[in-house]
Amino acid sequence: MTSRLLPMLCTALVLVCFSTAEAKNFRWSSQGDAATMDPQSQNETFNNMINGMVYEYLVDRDKEMKLAPRLAESWTNPEPTKWVFKLRRGVKWHDGSVFTADDVVFSFNRARESAVTFKLYSTQAGVARKIDDFTVEFTTDQPNPVMLDTLANIYVMNKAWCEKNNVVKPLNYTKKEETFATRNAMGTGPYKLVTWEQGVKILHTKNPDWWGIKAGLYEGNIETVDYRPIQNAATRMAALRSGQIDFVLDPAVQDVISMRNDKSLKIWEGPEIRLIYLGFDQARNELLYSDVKGKNPFKDRRVRLAAYQAIDVEALKTTVMRGLSRPTGIALPSASGAGVPASMDVRHPYSVTKAKQLLNEAGYPNGFGFTLTCPNDRYLNDEKLCVAIAGMWAKIGLRVKVERMTKANFFPRVQGRDATAFLAGWGGGSTDAIFFLKPIIHSKDSKGAGESNYGDAKFEALDVLIDKLEGEMNPALRQKMINDAVKMIHDEVHTIPLHTQVIPWASRNNISLVHRPNNVLGLIWVKVN
């Protein structure tokens, strides 16, 4: 009897072990933490990625970055300014209630109250109107050639949940407001938020009722997702190498070469849709945090051009970025994706001599001092970039104090227009130029444009051109407008483009995933093998 029971017992043990192995825990890290669980209050890629585990868009991007149906199943564009979306039936919120058109209309109206660029996106999407429980009509002010891209920016929230918890308006992250939605979330997405201990961990668990499982969208095997913010790069990488975590979103660039030779690890890398750039306060009559009194040097194009021409981007690529950057003269996250010809990718030439001459002509022969505000946990080597640039500016007499801070403090500062000069980045899923030109280059207006134009630069001709571009449906005319805008930004030195990032990810060698140029980790495709 014992001999017969033994094989049965072994089989049972194998089955138990197999079942346990299927319930995978995925542990990952990066240098920063989430900003808020309110999905309409802070438009920052990492924060959107965390919120995207819980909340969903009407349309979203697939593995190849193509737009695909999500909460909207299909759509038509019967008139130039009308779009009709058929919503997916059978979708349930995490509390078991049914997703309907009321939630969509509510969410787009709510986003219009946002203090950041979600206001712009909801305005571009037009007015949402419920036709029936599973049909929504959007009416826009003008034709929108990138309507679907626009919708892939607004997460849909549960109307009843927001009303019950008194969060019918997005919190103002810039003012550091706290509401129930700051630390709580309830969506339709593939994961449920279990807990967020700020600065310690974010824990999610798989939503077994997610509609995407039956639809075949869930290809991973993760039951729980355990995120741990680790600001120190060496500590982060030590945790990965020792197996304490499975994945690092932002390995230190200086470690990438050695990691490529480590057989216990995998390196995933490719170009990111993101521009790293410098901006200046061009609005105030007297510059903040500067030894110049009674005027603002950065209102003078010659000063901005001097700052531009004093920067050696090739040196930054070699010494700071270790090759993980692509210097550019085009102020767009993806020039090729926006259709801008390569012939336009020309920088104002690096020349310390010319930069000094420009400062002298502008009335600053001895230069001047000011503060450069930088994040130290947001972009690849962001703090080191600022320190290196400050050193380059010192050669022409610009005396720079580098003000370093976490992104939790950086974004409220710059969004509140409390910076003299700053280093920032902009990117995302869409490569269309309007998604950079409208929030970053256009001046601020009541419809949400210019919300991320942190220096409040204003050039009337650029504003007019961008406004026309926004509704232009003729591809050839639209491309000409994009090219013209790029040239005007370059000529006026609206901002100083530095480079687009090449993003490395690092994982244990038993992890499979999809590396995408929006720098968003799709957890539904991650497998722990």
List the predicted regions and their residue ranges:
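Ligand-site clamp/hinge motif
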Residues: 179, 209-258, 301, 391, ...
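Acidic-aromatic pocket-rim loops
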Residues: 42, 271-289, 294, 409-470, ...
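N-terminal lobe/hinge region of extracytoplasmic solute-binding protein
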Residues: 29-79, 109, 186-190
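Long beta-strand-rich cores associated with HINT superfamily self-processing modules
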Residues: 505-529
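Gly/Pro-rich hinge or "lid" segments in bacterial periplasmic/extracellular proteins
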Residues: 66, 154-220, 224-226, 352-353, ...
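Structural transition elements
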Residues: 191-192, 309, 326-361, 378-383
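Extracytoplasmic/peripheral linker and loop segments enriched in polar/acidic and small residues
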Residues: 84, 301-305, 309, 317-318, ...
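Surface-exposed binding/hinge segments that line
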Residues: 4-6, 76, 120-170, 195-197
